[in-house]
Curated annotation (Swiss-Prot):
Quaternary structure and partners: Interacts with the Sec translocase complex via SecD. Specifically interacts with transmembrane segments of nascent integral membrane proteins during membrane integration.
The protein's name in its UniProt record: Membrane protein insertase YidC
Gene transcribed to yield this protein: yidC
GO CC term (a single one): plasma membrane
Keyword set, alphabetical order: Cell inner membrane, Cell membrane, Chaperone, Membrane, Protein transport, Transmembrane, Transmembrane helix, Transport
Alphabetized Pfam families for the sequence: 60KD_IMP (PF02096), YidC_periplas (PF14849)
InterPro entries listed in its UniProt record: Membr_insert_YidC, Membr_insert_YidC_N, YidC/ALB3/OXA1/COX18, YidC/Oxa/ALB_C, YidC_ALB_C, YidC_periplasmic_sf
Lineage of source species: Bacteria, Pseudomonadati, Pseudomonadota, Gammaproteobacteria, Alteromonadales
Regions that span the bilayer: 6-26, 325-345, 349-369, 420-440, 457-477, 500-520
Chain's role: Required for the insertion and/or proper folding and/or complex formation of integral membrane proteins into the membrane. Involved in integration of membrane proteins that insert both dependently and independently of the Sec translocase complex, as well as at least some lipoproteins. Aids folding of multispanning membrane proteins.
Source organism of this protein record: Shewanella baltica (strain OS195)
Membrane topology label: Multi-pass membrane protein
Entry's Gene Ontology BP terms: protein insertion into membrane; protein transport
Subcellular location: Cell inner membrane
Amino acid sequence: MESQRNILLIGLLFVSFLLWQQWQADKAPKPVATESSLVANAANSHSADVPEADTGVPAAVTATSKLITVKTDQLDVQINPIGGDIVFAALVSHKMEQDKDQPFVLLEQTKDFTYIAQSGLIGRDGIDSSAKGRAAFSTAATEYTLAEGQDTLEVPLTYVADNGVTYTKVFVFHRGKFNVDVDYKINNTSAAPLQVQMYGQIKQTIKPSESSMVMPTYRGGAFSTQDVRYEKYKFDDMAKSNLNQATLGGWAAMLQHYFVSAWIPPATDSNTIFSSVSAGGLANIGFRGAVYDIAPGATQEISSQFYVGPKDQKALSAISDTLNLVVDYGFLWWLAVPIHWLLMFYQSFVGNWGLAIILITLTVRGLLFPLTKAQYTSMAKMRNLQPKLTDLKERFGDDRQKMGQAMMELYKKEKVNPMGGCLPIILQMPIFIALYWVLLESFELRHAPFMLWIHDLSVQDPYYILPLLMGVSMFVMQKMQPIAPTMDPMQVKMMQWMPVIFTVFFLWFPAGLVLYWLVGNIVAITQQKIIYAGLAKKGLK
């Protein structure tokens, strides 16, 4: 009876978890979409000197202003010489779709959608501002390619102002990496001092996340400061209030499932993390750096980094000790982090993510085996106590206080913990939820094949075979536990439908998660047989 109730408890906890996370996603108001409110918000922006970006294709990109193309082993990038903005970025080593050769496009600027990385110099003598417009850079070539044996590729852009000051903007690309160094070199050949300030921002058309109850994903902003290690800043947050936080270091990013773009200014600089929403419906998040005073005849260098790529925790940690937090495991991150590490460890040996999931399932079940054994032992003792519990109910009738006291004395005498059957279930749920987030957030599982018909563990089984097998395994587990005569008829009906309900839920779950649950059930059935054989020798049934 207790086992049946425990399975029911798992179902209720699991459904409650899904409903809770869907409520979390839906409870906040949607982004303000009216033109008047967006204009008002833009007018109140703390980043008023930062230039706006037009929606659609920039008018400046004409036959006389050709985009600069940069190709490396990881990135295919296009830079607009007007301002030096990155207006296109494709990830060469990541496909848009598994069965096609088209690379995944993260940044782009089309008629209907804008997602670009903008940077420039603002301030009193800045060459990029709302009032002055953008600088028109010149470059020696319009196509750059990282050659074989070449570790870095520099793309220099030059602008000479009316006062004779030379501004050089250099993009530095690295082999095997998704981060780009953006360096300014200002040679003040004028007779007057200059004052400039670097900024970097990411601009994106407000677009809803492609999220569902079983596959919740986030699309929006995020930032980090010296006081706030990591915080999401949703599009509706930007529409309601402009972010304006002073910090040492920090970073600002746009997130989506598996991928991130981020500006990371120097960790020792005084920066301001800001956000805004422009009148055209573009959400902006970025940083404004320190103000530099450049004396006549002096040269000043100002640098920052831009990352555009997958949520690779190792690569992100190498750039900033908090940037890896964009891989958000939720409130059980402390449990998910070691699970992810163990998953990576197993995969490095077996070379297959599906086998790694099976190994981590065996590990989890092995660690929980002592608790599982204690659970079934407690349940067996409870079953043996049923005749005595029935006698207590008949003896005390409706006197619940005396009956409860007598039951506790009986449990103490027989050394039975009535909650012993629930504890392993309660401990397994956080592990399951943590693994759920690991499989959902880990970009390594994107397009990762297992075997046979499972070509991508990050999406649902295309033929629903794993969910059906999982349902069968639950049915077998259920049949191995006899239904006690004292069990409530309503609970019996709910228990009979639980394998069906779980099967329906798991139809749309990532195949990797269903694989974990299926293997876990098979292991549980095996453990159950072993434990029951041992209990039978002790006279417990």
